A protein has these predicted regions:
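Conserved catalytic-core segment of nucleotide-activated headgroup transferases in glycan assembly
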Residues: 23, 27-30, 148-151, 158-267
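N-terminal subdomain of nucleotide-sugar transferases
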Residues: 1-51, 223-233
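C-terminal alpha-helical cap of glycosyltransferases
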Residues: 359-382
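Extended catalytic core of nucleotide-activated donor transferases of GT-like folds
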Residues: 15-17, 31-150, 271-275
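Short, flexible/disordered intra-domain loops and linkers
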Residues: 17-27, 116-123, 248-251, 320-325
């Protein structure tokens, strides 16, 4: 690695309110995890979060501001060696200012912007004018975004992209579950069916349902087929979150789900938005998931870290949970039935296995820290 000194690093956030929850989306979590990774570097980087909006920075921020300080752009624009634009975009004027003083500017792409942009165009979703910044020193793209958006970024921004590792940490999850039973970790519960000897399971589907990438329909079909095989003896209820608007206002959605056995027999509920840790702790034994072009997600790690059975098709973390390939619903059903019948036999071993598999993504992982220092060196010492 090219020799690198300690750097003053800023990571952008774009606050919309003074007490904005970190569970609104994954962006602020991403900024915190990346900041923690750089703080763990043996080089001793100085790291701060840089807010790009006019929202005031107060003690209402939902993280430890002594550990992860946040500042206004104008207050730190002369005190940065590197600015990583992650959660809030800077303007053309701000870009010119940083470039004039020699600050390196990195675009950290953690969203499927190609898909989001074409959906805005096709479905007239409000996006607003788009500022295409072509003055970056590097474009870093996380693995799950590469397939859909890498060439979109590189063409518009006139710079090759660099795939960078995905980073996570359980700190936000642990802060949220501290007061929950068993600190939010899975425990077998309920009464065993006297005929089968098994405890009926509570299923959950928690896709955002705001685009085609993470939608609830395939998980619903997996749950339906498993219900047809096992019935109420094995499945006590299915909750589908972020779906009340679909169940109330989408004729297409209603026409499909109304004839499902699990719906007709009153075993399914379509509810609103919930934060993941509390919903898992209070209402869930098994999570069923499906994605299309976004095969790594913090949600996957939150479910598995705390030991919940996870039926999914995310091939970039296929070692987690109970995996099925692509849209192979039959395998998804088999995996769900296996979890219903056998997960509780070794739930502690399962949780330990999940945490071991997630270690390679942690902000404290020495190999990951070294990779990011090498990435910084390539930008700062080309």
């Amino acid at each position: 690695m090219t020799k690198l000194r300690a750097l003053r690093i800023g990571i952008t956030i774009g606050l919309r309110s003074e007490s904005e929850s970190i569970w609104v989306n994954g962006i602020k979590q991403n900024a915190l995890y990346l900041a923690k990774l750089f703080q763990h570097s043996p080089l001793g980087h100085s790291v701060m979060l840089v807010n790009t909006t006019t929202v005031a920075l107060t003690d209402a921020l939902p993280w430890d501001t002594k550990r992860f300080p946040a500042r206004r752009f104008d207050d730190v624009k002369d005190a940065l060696d590197v600015l990583i634009e992650l959660g809030g975009q800077i303007s053309d004027e701000q870009t010119r200012y940083l470039k004039a003083r020699g600050t390196k500017l990195i675009s950290y792409c953690c969203g499927p912007e190609y898909v989001q942009m074409i959906e805005a165009m096709i479905f007239r979703r409000v996006s607003g004018p788009v500022f295409i910044n072509q003055q970056y020193d590097a474009i870093w793209v996380i693995p799950q975004v590469m397939e859909t958006s890498a060439h979109f970024f590189s063409t518009l921004r006139r710079l090759p992209v660099r795939e960078v590792p995905f980073v996570w940490d359980p700190m936000c999850l642990q802060a949220s579950t501290r007061r929950l039973p068993f600190e939010g970790e899975y425990r077998p519960g309920g009464y065993a069916n006297p005929r089968t000897g098994r405890r009926p399971k509570r299923l959950a589907v928690m896709e955002p349902n705001i685009d085609v990438l993470k939608f609830c329909l395939y998980p619903l079909l997996i749950a339906e087929q498993a219900f047809r095989i096992e019935g109420g003896d094995a499945i006590v209820h299915l909750h589908v979150t972020n779906a009340d608007h679909l169940a109330r206002h989408s004729p297409e959605f209603i026409s499909i789900v109304k004839d499902l056995d699990i719906v007709r027999m009153g075993k399914a509920s379509f509810v609103g938005r919930y934060d993941t840790p509390h919903f898992l702790s209070e209402h869930t034994d098994i999570v069923i998931s499906h994605q299309w072009g976004l095969a790594l997600n913090y949600f996957h790690f939150e479910v598995c870290w705390n030991g919940f059975a996870f039926i999914h098709n995310a091939h970039l973390c296929r070692e987690l949970g109970y995996f099925y390939e692509g849209n192979d619903i039959e395998t998804g059903v088999r995996q769900l039935l296996h979890a219903i019948r056998h997960h509780d036999n070794d739930w502690q071993g399962y949780r330990a296995k999940q945490r071991k598999a997630i270690l390679r993504f942690l902000a404290s992982n020495l190999g990951l820290i070294s990779q990011y220092d090498e990435l910084l060196a390539d930008v700062c010492n080309p």
